[in-house]
Amino acid sequence: MLKLQIFFLLLTAEIKRKDEMKRIIVAALLFCCWGASVAFSQNELRKELEAVIRDKKARVGVAVIYDGKDTLTLNNEYRYPMMSVFKFHQALSVLNDLDSGGLPLDTEIFVKKSDLHPDTYSPLRDSVPQGNFDMTVAELLRYSITLSDNNACDILFKHFGGTGKTEKYMKGLGIEKIVIQFDENEMHTSVDAERANWTTPLEAAKVMDIFLRNKLFSVSLSDFLENLLICTSTGADKIKGGLPSGVIMGHKTGSSSRTARGTKIADNDLAFVQLPDGKRYTIAVFVMDADEDDKTIAGIISQIS
């Protein structure tokens, strides 16, 4: 499996697991003195990445950022449908609103029965189908991020300025190659609508890097979102599936429906990975127009992690 260790300066971290010591080779990029070696390693890694995707019927885009620097990209020139990855972007915008407005995470929102759309993925609706109850912003974010609940996401859009406000917030962070036009319910109306919300792998990785490296809002709000990402239950067989034990990671996945001919429009994973020495990198692996089954697509993503 690829562990990004080819273009990183190798570090050795010993992790105690039960009664055994497991040695994990991890990576930390040396940007200054090892320029030639890094360039060589990037080329070698790119070759390995290309080998992973060469025979796959899909377009695969990859971006890795370490220490705030664009470490490596592959097929980054295309517009990749975001799918539910945009729930992470939305969460940043919502938390910014709470922070700037002095509102707590336990601010309550009234959830109507009409907010709980029936033909979409929604553990929230399944647990309280009758609707007409109050729920805190914290709980709605938990449903939206950790469970990727589509109704929770749209309720947050409804009460925090819609998709346009989230896109505007991204532009304010310097993220230019991004469009967030439709909410989850609207995306279900057509294939074109599913494709309309797009970004590039590098821009997605940048958003995660900005969140980790900058004080966008209070420490408590930042810690709250980071914990939600770590607790995310979706996509265990994607980036997370390719990582060794002893590594902390948080992520947001996004997966589409299939077209009438069976093509998967998009299947994505955006993550941060914390190595045993505390260093972090962000990685985005976006797959689109895949004529492969879900297991194969997940395998592609996990190999790249």
What kind of region is each of these model predictions?
Residues 116-154:
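Conserved catalytic neighborhood of penicillin-recognizing serine enzymes
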Residues 42-51, 55, 158-159, 163-164, ...:
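Structured C-terminal helix/loop/strand segments within mature extracytoplasmic catalytic/sensor domains
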Residues 40-81, 257:
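Beta-lactamase-like hydrolase cores
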Residues 96-116, 163, 218-222:
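Short, well-structured active-site flanking segments
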Residues 81-109, 144, 283:
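Active-site SXXK
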Residues 59, 133, 154-216:
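Mid-domain, small-residue-enriched loop/turn segments at the edges of structured enzyme/sensor domains
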Residues 1-44:
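Bacterial Sec-dependent N-terminal signal peptides
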